[in-house]
């Protein structure tokens, strides 16, 4: 069954949150697609993932890469699973994919300070529950650590 995790960003950027979540995914041996809603955003995330920290390397490519099937992380703007990912991150209000049931995990990261993003996340929550997916909601505590909320 597909597990859907909703990550509620407040007073933090996607750029600060995404790299550690991707690192944890790779540590677990998962392959990942990160879907945003524009080519410009995907390219900005691509540049950020190469430079976000001096002492790390996060192997990835965009959907345009000729060897996308060999990459552990693909940044995309459309549906599809070019690298046979187990996990799909949905950022910037990217919609649930038609093949959502084909992933072990979907991670919907949304900006809680953006009314449209909040409304879209609520709609996605309802949709995921209706599809029978296991859904969890995550928010940071006062120390900035992710905590599951019920």
What are these regions (language model features)?
Residues 105-150:
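Glycine-rich, aromatic-bearing surface loops/beta-hairpins
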Residues 2-4, 25-31, 94-101, 123-131:
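ASCE RecA-like P-loop NTPase motor cores
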Residues 16, 83-98:
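An N-terminal amphipathic alpha-helical segment
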Residues 1-47:
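Long, hydrophobic N-terminal alpha-helical segment
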Residues 47-88:
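Helix-adjacent hinge/juxtasegments
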Residues 21-24, 48-52, 106, 123-127:
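Short, solvent-exposed amphipathic alpha-helical segments in soluble enzyme
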Residues 9-10, 33-39, 74-76, 89-94, 107, 111-112:
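Structural motif
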């Amino acid at each position: 069954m597909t597990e859907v995790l909703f990550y509620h960003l407040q007073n933090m950027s996607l750029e600060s949150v995404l790299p550690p979540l991707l690192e944890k995914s790779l540590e677990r041996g998962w392959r990942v697609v990160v879907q945003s809603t524009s080519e410009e955003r995907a390219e900005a995330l691509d540049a950020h993932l190469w430079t976000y920290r001096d002492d790390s390397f996060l192997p990835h490519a965009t959907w345009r890469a000729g060897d996308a099937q060999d990459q552990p992380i693909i940044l995309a703007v459309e549906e599809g699973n070019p690298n046979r990912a187990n996990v799909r991150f949905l950022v910037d209000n990217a919609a649930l994919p038609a093949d959502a049931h084909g992933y072990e995990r979907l991670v919907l990261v949304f900006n809680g300070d953006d009314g449209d993003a909040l409304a879209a996340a609520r709609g996605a929550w309802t949709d995921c529950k209706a599809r029978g997916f296991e859904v969890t909601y995550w928010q940071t505590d006062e120390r900035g650590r992710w905590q599951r909320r019920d």
